[in-house]
């Protein structure tokens, strides 16, 4: 008894918890009950008492205790040895009477438990049925024996009160033919049950009235049946139907349908002989209800039949017509849902149908959450012809999961079915042939029913839900897992679900303690749900819950159709948008049997339209569809081309001039008038981006001014972020561009995808753009910059006829004037100094506007884009990606060095978009072959004629005069050039020619660099490896000129390298993509690690040395640099001394960095090693004398001016960026006085750093060389 006491204490401790009760608590109670199984009677009694005495809100938890105990016992000991279920069933009626005293909201939970019991055969259907009736407010049926004394003569007239309902009365009140069918007490009890409701009493009264009128001698019943009776019949049937629909709970008629498949199966195959074998003493309520169903069918069928026999056909027709408006959906939905239940009596009168429907609805209301009820209710009033035709099909089509039971063929049901059959034959009077017909019909329907049942079983095995007529089933394969331990990992879930099948994804939400597991196959998800919901499976310390989850593909507008129990969204065909079909399958699958065949034809016609677009965008972004539409918004027909853009890139629609997208070349007469600012310039799809044009090929004969209507995605340079592989498919056959038209193409190609469509500078612009950009977003599969920011008239449009001098770099930052700020829209005509921030600067005549993404044509005087620091002679546009300045006529294309003659403003990728671009800088891809191939590997084919010179433009192309400042050689790394760097602009001036004062960069170094650089100006670009190698973040940034704030995160850093051989500013580092910047960018610039940067020794050595130094502490910073999204202000290290020698300089060859490098080394290196070195005084001296001074002197000479100028900037930046800096006060002084190398060795420094510093210095060179060599 100790176990019983323990159980009682657990059970009554429920009162200490506020409902709902946790699963853990239920588990404890269940365990206590199982331990006390020897005293199971006590346990059962305790639970029943608890339910009886507890507060209303604890009634349902009490039921859950019963459920948990019974199911656990069955699970543990097997159904046969389970003692709890039979014991609970002894007193279950009174227990449920107590349970139904719960709050009204909880009744649905009780019904749900009953349905689950029924579904899982926890209790017999005859036990559960009365409990369900109770929920509907129907008192449990009382079976009273029929006694002779209870019979009384029925002499009631319509006006007199109705006699009390007793089986005997019922029998007497029925016409003789009916009485012959109602013989035993079972049937009588069932009829009594039916007639106990008010509707039943009305029905009885109507029957009596009909009987009385039949007895009166009247010429015809037509006269006898006054309209009032018909109206009453109609009202009654309508009332019953409405009642069924209104009640969530079951109405008496609904009980007519048995819930239990077992029970129905009992009737399914059984002949009368089978029924006689069953014990007559037990008259389960469900059996009674089943009988009552047949009686219902009989009664109403007989009424209708009588009316027909009396030639009242037109009356019934009238009845049907009045009821037809009530039909919610066509008959076939009824058939689909109900299966063969309707085939049982296809042509019965409308009144009988009304009764039958609620019963069928019962099935669906329970299993399909009553969603079908509304649809199915009024469907009864369908003409007889429909019934006759459909009766044959119904059995085959019935698919509802629950209809194995509804297909039952009890003798009575067969009788009613056969009657309907005989009535079809001209309603001849009932005859003996009915029995033969019944057999024939039952055998026929049986085979079809069996097929339907087998098909249904197959679907159930696959975990597919019942099919609803004219409804699309979107079956979820996503499972919600609840009560997941917060410490659980994704691997725990994977381990649990792997056994069921392939997992597509797992999305954990630890704060809510849940997860969404998406399986690849519905069947796997179904099995996982079945198994994991039945037992207590734990993840970590918690027992998980599991249920169906709405799959991702179903949008909110369809959530109302979601059925959580079945894990399916039933979407009516009329509400399905064909465009959404593919999306539905995300996280789920579409039941192909429910797909409307018409959709297939619609979809098959659509691809034809889209083929044109897809050919134009060979590298569409995954899951992006390319759609071409004629924009009706604009008065002229404008083809809106949507180019898939890399997912991170905002899409904008290009509005080309009024040509269809498919048109490869604009009509000859088309003039290159720039579109209004809010429209994008158009590009010629037939022409490749400027960077790709083979230089040697003479331009085809095409009017240069022509503006291509649209830029085909394939032509557009793939966005930088793309990998070369994505570009492989692009066909370059069409890439050759007529010289005249090159400009237009060039402008587009240069735009980086990330930035494309964002007018970096202009903020007002977005508003104008919105309609176009949003409505027709151009997504370029390649992320290509092909689209130009709205404001920019595409070069094609702007450049139209332009002086040949305009060059464009695809993917390379064009030259921009640092000082000039460009408006995202169009700057309008500007003097040569105009630079565009958008990220593309083309040399433009002063008149040219520059658009947000592209700088209009600028006079050659424009020296470089923000990204390029080098000063160019005024005439030469500098392409960040191009090496060297070219005569104005020579266009630089990133891929071609000066390949193209005149046309083509440089296109800089719109760097201004600060955030988009960085993360995947195409630059990396481009770098390897940088200058020659703007896109680099991406369009290798495009420049057949051009040698892949690393950074050197063909001599013929480049003018030596032009070269002096050309930092151009630095390759496309510059693509991210920053259009205008406010910081840089002023600084640079000294460097630039007088003509472009704005452009100049403050660095005095520029001039110096020229001297030193010449030798190294076009060093071969390092292998891609070096390029991609992440640079030490600090160094680069430090070296570069101050970084523009603009350069900040989003915009790809421009390589300031133009400035001197040294990389000017590593904006890039600031930007997201640092790795490329450092090494890669250097390579781009043509500074090989192998080549000496300045007078000093190999790049390689320094670079590597620096890298290692950074290696330890740097790791984090490098990472940060790579994905920097922080204060870019500090990152750049544009400090004066940094400025003097780009960060690279620091990293690679600047001794000045030594001080903090030393500190860093101290931190990073083994202290033992450091200490040894520190101890060696000679080593320090040696270092000072031999090693440090020469490099410093050179460095100073080289970058003197810059160093002095930039001191201030660098300090904060360095601190922000580099860990080295933080910990090292000594380095700061060094920065402040970079020129004084001696300071490092000065007594102060020595004191600060102590011997360690000196030792570090010594060690550093060693480390450098070692690492460099290794590298």
UniProtKB/Swiss-Prot annotation:
Pfam families: CID, RRM_1. It is found in: Nucleus; Nucleus matrix. Keywords: Isopeptide bond, Methylation, Nucleus, Phosphoprotein, RNA-binding, Transcription, Transcription regulation, Ubl conjugation. The modification Phosphothreonine is found at residues 6, 615. There is a cross-link at residue 18 (Glycyl lysine isopeptide (Lys-Gly) (interchain with G-Cter in SUMO1)). SUPFAM superfamilies: ENTH/VHS domain (SSF48464), RNA-binding domain, RBD (SSF54928). Disulfide bonds: none annotated. Residues 270-289, 322-354, 384-468, 899-918, 945-1064, 1198-1271 are annotated as: Disordered. The modification Phosphoserine is found at residues 273, 617, 779. Residues 477-551 form the RRM domain. Residues 1-139 form the CID domain. Residues 394-443 have a biased composition (Basic residues). GO terms for cellular component: cytoplasm; mRNA cleavage factor complex; nuclear matrix; nucleoplasm; nucleus. Residues 327-354 have a biased composition (Polar residues). The keyword Aminoacyl-tRNA synthetase does not apply. Residues 1255-1271 have a biased composition (Acidic residues). GO terms for molecular function: mRNA binding; RNA binding; RNA polymerase core enzyme binding; RNA polymerase II C-terminal domain phosphoserine binding; RNA polymerase II complex binding. Residues 902-912, 945-956, 963-972 have a biased composition (Pro residues). GO terms for biological process: negative regulation of termination of RNA polymerase II transcription, poly(A)-coupled; positive regulation of DNA-templated transcription, elongation; termination of RNA polymerase II transcription. The modification Asymmetric dimethylarginine is found at residues 917, 927, 938, 1073. Residues 270-283, 447-461, 1011-1027, 1034-1064 have a biased composition (Basic and acidic residues). Anti-terminator protein required to prevent early mRNA termination during transcription. Together with SCAF4, acts by suppressing the use of early, alternative poly(A) sites, thereby preventing the accumulation of non-functional truncated proteins. Mechanistically, associates with the phosphorylated C-terminal heptapeptide repeat domain (CTD) of the largest RNA polymerase II subunit (POLR2A), and subsequently binds nascent RNA upstream of early polyadenylation sites to prevent premature mRNA transcript cleavage and polyadenylation. Interacts with POLR2A; via C-terminal heptapeptide repeat domain (CTD) phosphorylated at 'Ser-2' and 'Ser-5'. Identified in a complex with CDC5L and other spliceosomal proteins. This is SR-related and CTD-associated factor 8.
């Amino acid at each position: 008894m100790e176990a019983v006491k323990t159980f009682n204490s657990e059970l009554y401790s429920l009162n200490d918890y506020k409902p709902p009760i946790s699963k853990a608590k239920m588990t404890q109670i269940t365990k206590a009950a199982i331990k006390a199984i020897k005293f199971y009677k006590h346990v059962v009694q305790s639970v029943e008492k608890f339910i009886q005495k507890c507060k209303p809100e604890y009634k349902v938890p009490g039921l859950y205790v019963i459920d948990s105990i019974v199911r656990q016992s069955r699970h543990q000991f097997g159904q046969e040895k389970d003692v709890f279920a039979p014991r609970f069933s002894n007193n279950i009626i009174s227990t449920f009477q107590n349970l139904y005293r719960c709050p009204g909201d909880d009744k649905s939970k009780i019904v749900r438990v009953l349905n689950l019991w029924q579904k899982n055969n926890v209790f017999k259907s005859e036990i559960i049925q009365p409990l369900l009736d109770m929920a509907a407010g129907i008192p449990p049926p009382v079976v009273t024996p029929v006694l002779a004394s209870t019979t009384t003569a029925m002499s009631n007239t319509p006006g007199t009160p109705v006699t009390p309902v007793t089986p005997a009365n019922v029998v007497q009140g029925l016409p003789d033919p009916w009485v012959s069918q109602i013989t035993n007490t079972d049937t009588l009890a069932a009829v009594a049950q039916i007639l106990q409701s008010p509707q039943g009493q009305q029905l009885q009264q109507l029957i009596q009235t009909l009987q009385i009128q039949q007895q009166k001698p009247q010429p015809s019943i037509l006269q006898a049946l006054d309209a009032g009776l018909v109206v009453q019949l109609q009202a009654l049937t309508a009332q019953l139907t409405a009642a069924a629909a209104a009640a969530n709970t079951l109405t008496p008629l609904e009980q007519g349908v048995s819930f239990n498949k077992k029970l129905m199966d009992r009737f399914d195959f059984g002949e009368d002989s089978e029924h006689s074998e069953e014990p007559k003493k037990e008259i389960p309520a469900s059996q009674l209800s089943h009988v009552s169903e047949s009686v219902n069918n009989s009664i109403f069928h007989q009424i209708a039949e009588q009316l027909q026999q009396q030639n009242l056909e037109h009356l019934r027709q009238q009845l049907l017509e009045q009821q037809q408006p009530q039909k919610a959906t066509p008959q076939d939905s009824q058939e689909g849902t109900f299966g063969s239940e309707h085939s049982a009596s296809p042509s019965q009168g409308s009144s009988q149908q009304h009764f039958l429907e609620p019963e069928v609805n019962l099935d669906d209301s329970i299993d399909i959450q009553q969603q079908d009820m509304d649809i199915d209710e009024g469907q009864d009033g369908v003409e007889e012809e429909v019934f006759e035709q459909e009766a044959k099909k119904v059995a085959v089509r019935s698919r509802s999961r629950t209809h194995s039971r509804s297909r039952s063929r009890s003798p009575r049901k067969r009788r009613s079915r056969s009657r309907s059959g005989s009535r079809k034959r001209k309603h001849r009077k009932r005859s003996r042939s009915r029995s033969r017909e019944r057999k024939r019909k039952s055998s026929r329907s049986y085979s079809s029913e069996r097929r339907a049942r087998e098909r249904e079983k197959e679907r159930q095995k696959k975990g597919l839900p019942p099919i609803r007529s004219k409804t699309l089933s979107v079956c979820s394969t996503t499972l919600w897992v609840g009560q997941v331990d917060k410490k659980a990992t994704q691997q725990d879930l994977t381990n649990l679900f792997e056994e069921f099948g392939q997992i597509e994804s797992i999305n954990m939400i630890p704060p809510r303690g849940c997860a969404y597991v998406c399986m690849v196959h519905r069947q796997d998800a179904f099995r996982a749900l079945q198994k994991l919901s039945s037992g207590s499976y734990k993840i970590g310390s918690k027992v998980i819950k599991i249920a169906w989850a709405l799959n991702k593909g179903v949008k909110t507008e369809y959530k109302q159709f979601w059925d959580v129990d079945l894990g399916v969204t039933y979407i009516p065909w009329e509400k399905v948008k064909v465009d959404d079909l593919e999306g539905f399958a995300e996280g789920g699958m579409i039941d192909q049997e429910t797909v409307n065949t018409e959709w297939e034809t619609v979809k098959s016609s659509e691809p034809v339209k889209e083929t044109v677009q897809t050919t134009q965008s060979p590298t569409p972004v995954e899951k992006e569809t390319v759609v071409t539409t004629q924009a009706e918004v604009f008065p002229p027909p404008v083809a809106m081309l949507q180019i898939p853009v890399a997912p991170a890139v905002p899409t904008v629609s290009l509005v080309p001039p009024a040509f269809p997208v498919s048109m490869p070349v604009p009509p000859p007469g088309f003039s290159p008038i720039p579109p209004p600012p809010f429209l994008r310039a158009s590009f010629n799809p037939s022409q490749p981006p400027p960077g790709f044009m083979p230089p040697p090929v003479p331009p085809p004969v095409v009017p240069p001014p022509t503006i291509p209507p649209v830029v085909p995605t394939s032509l557009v340079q793939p966005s930088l972020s793309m990998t070369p592989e994505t570009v492989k498919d692009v066909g370059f056959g069409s890439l050759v561009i007529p010289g005249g038209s090159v400009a237009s193409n060039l402008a587009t190609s240069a735009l980086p995808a990330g930035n494309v469509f964002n007018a970096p500078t202009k903020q007002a612009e977005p508003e104008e753009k919105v309609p176009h950009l949003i409505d027709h977003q151009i997504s370029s599969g390649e992320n290509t910059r092909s689209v130009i920011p709205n404001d920019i008239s595409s070069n094609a449009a702007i450049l139209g006829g332009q002086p040949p001098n305009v060059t464009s770099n695809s993917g390379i930052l064009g030259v921009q004037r640092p000082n000039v700020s460009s408006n995202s829209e169009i700057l309008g005509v500007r003097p040569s100094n105009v630079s565009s921030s958008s990220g593309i600067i083309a040399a433009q005549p002063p008149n040219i506007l520059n658009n947000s993404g592209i700088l209009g044509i600028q006079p050659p005087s424009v020296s470089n884009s923000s990204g390029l620091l080098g000063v160019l002679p005024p005439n030469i546009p500098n392409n960040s990606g191009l090496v060297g300045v070219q005569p104005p006529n020579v266009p630089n294309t990133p891929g071609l060095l000066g390949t193209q003659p005149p046309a083509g403003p440089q296109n800089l990728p719109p760097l201004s978009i600060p955030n988009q671009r960085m993360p995947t800088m195409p630059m990396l891809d481009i770098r390897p072959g940088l200058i020659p191939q703007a896109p680099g590997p991406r369009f290798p084919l495009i420049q057949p004629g051009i040698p892949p010179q690393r950074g050197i433009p063909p001599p013929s192309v480049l003018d030596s005069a032009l070269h002096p400042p050309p930092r151009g050689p630095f390759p496309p790394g510059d693509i991210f050039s920053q259009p205008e760097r406010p910081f840089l602009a002023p600084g640079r001036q000294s460097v630039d020619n007088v003509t472009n004062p704005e452009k100049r960069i403050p660095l005095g170094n520029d001039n110096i660099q020229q001297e030193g650089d010449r030798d190294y100006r076009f060093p071969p670009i390092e292998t891609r490896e070096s390029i991609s190698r992440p640079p030490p973040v600090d160094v680069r940034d430090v070296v570069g000129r101050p970084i523009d704030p603009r350069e900040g995160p989003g915009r790809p850093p421009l390589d300031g390298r133009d400035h001197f051989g040294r990389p000017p500013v590593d904006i890039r580092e600031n930007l997201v993509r640092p790795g490329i910047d450092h090494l890669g960018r250097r390579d781009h610039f043509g500074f090989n690690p192998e080549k000496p940067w300045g007078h000093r020794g190999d790049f390689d050595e320094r670079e590597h040395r620096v890298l290692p130094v950074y290696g330890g502490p740097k790791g984090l910073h490098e990472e940060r640099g790579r994905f920097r999204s922080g204060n870019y202000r500090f990152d750049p290290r544009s400090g004066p001394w940094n400025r003097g020698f780009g960060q690279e300089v620091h990293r690679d060859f600047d001794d000045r960095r030594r001080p903090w490098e030393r500190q860093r080394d101290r931190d990073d290196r083994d202290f033992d090693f450091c200490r040894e070195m520190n101890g060696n005084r000679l080593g320090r001296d040696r270092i000072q004398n031999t090693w440090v001074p020469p490099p410093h002197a050179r460095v100073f000479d080289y970058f003197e001016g810059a160093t002095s100028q930039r001191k201030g900037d660098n300090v904060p930046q360095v601190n922000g960026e580099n860990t080295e800096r933080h910990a090292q006060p000594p380095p700061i002084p060094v920065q402040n006085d970079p020129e004084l190398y001696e300071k490092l060795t000065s007594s102060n420094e020595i004191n600060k750093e102590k011997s360690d510093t000196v030792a570090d210095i010594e060690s550093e060179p060693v480390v450098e060389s070692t690492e460099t060599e290794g590298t």
